[in-house]
Amino acid sequence: MNRKKLQKLTDTLTKNCKHFDKFEVKCLITLFYNLVGDVAERPGVVTGLDRNVFRNILHVTFGMTDDMIMDRVFRGFDKDNDGCISVSEWIHGLSLFLRGTLDEKMKYCFEVFDLNGDGFISKEEMFHMLKNSLLKQPSEEDPDEGIKDLVEITLKKMDHDHDGKLSFVDYEKAVREENLLLEAFGPCLPDPKSQMEFEAQVFKDPNEFNDM
């Protein structure tokens, strides 16, 4: 991408970006095109990060390991649901991912955890997500029992209207009372160390990012 195009794109994306300044947006655009590769300049080809490339970034850079959660994070970034992350989706997604307010992060995490998109986190959804985070003990007759117990404990803590599922209102109230519950069903945001390392590297020289 030539300098003029890059400058124009930077100006456009900075206008709609809450948490990055112009220099940071420029670095993230440069990184995006480094990750996408040569396809960027081909006419008629949709430019974007596909699911595999994006999941690799989540895994290698931000230490995420849960396939289900990584898939949901991809969907959270891919707002137009076209199967790849465009440069504007990349900037807006990272703005929240790295520097979002508590309100923004609550909305994002809830959408990640609401696996079927019906506006609630059901017992079944909790079970699926928590199952991946618990180690099975070989001595247990029914390893799912421990997970079912954990679901019940979580509901008791977070289900304020006692309807057997979590609405956003339930979730928000619980998280405001105890911030640690933000990622109650699995890590879907970077930990502070990964975030600092990513920002230090990318906002210094995005061209060296792949050497990390």
From Swiss-Prot:
One of its GO terms (cellular component) is cilium. Ca(2+) 3 binds at D159, D161, D163, K165, D170. It holds the Pfam family EF-hand_1. Keywords: Calcium, Cell projection, Cilium, Cytoplasm, Cytoskeleton, Flagellum, Metal-binding, Repeat. It is found in: Cytoplasm, Cytoskeleton, Cilium axoneme; Cell projection, Cilium; Cell projection, Cilium, Flagellum. Ca(2+) 1 binds at D78, D80, D82, C84, E89. PROSITE patterns: EF_HAND_1, EF_HAND_2. Disruption phenotype: Mice display typical phenotypes of primary ciliary dyskinesia, including hydrocephalus, situs inversus, and abnormal motility of trachea cilia and sperm flagella. Strikingly, both males and females are viable and fertile. The 9 + 2 axonemal structures of epithelial multicilia and sperm flagella are normal, but the formation of 9 + 0 nodal cilia is significantly disrupted. GO terms for biological process: cell chemotaxis; cilium movement; outer dynein arm assembly; regulation of cilium movement; regulation of flagellated sperm motility. SUPFAM superfamilies: EF-hand. Residues 65-100, 101-136, 146-181 form the EF-hand domain. InterPro entries: EF-hand-dom_pair (IPR011992), EF_Hand_1_Ca_BS (IPR018247), EF_hand_dom (IPR002048), Recoverin (IPR028846). Its main location: cytoplasm. Ca(2+) 2 binds at D114, N116, D118, E125. GO terms for molecular function: beta-tubulin binding; calcium ion binding; calcium-dependent outer dynein arm binding; cytoskeletal motor regulator activity; dynein heavy chain binding. Component of the outer dynein arm-docking complex along with ODAD1, ODAD2, ODAD3 and ODAD4. Component of the outer dynein arm-docking complex (ODA-DC) that mediates outer dynein arms (ODA) binding onto the doublet microtubule. Seems to regulate the assembly of both ODAs and their axonemal docking complex onto ciliary microtubules. Regulates ciliary and flagellar motility and is required for cilia-driven determination of body laterality. This is Calaxin.
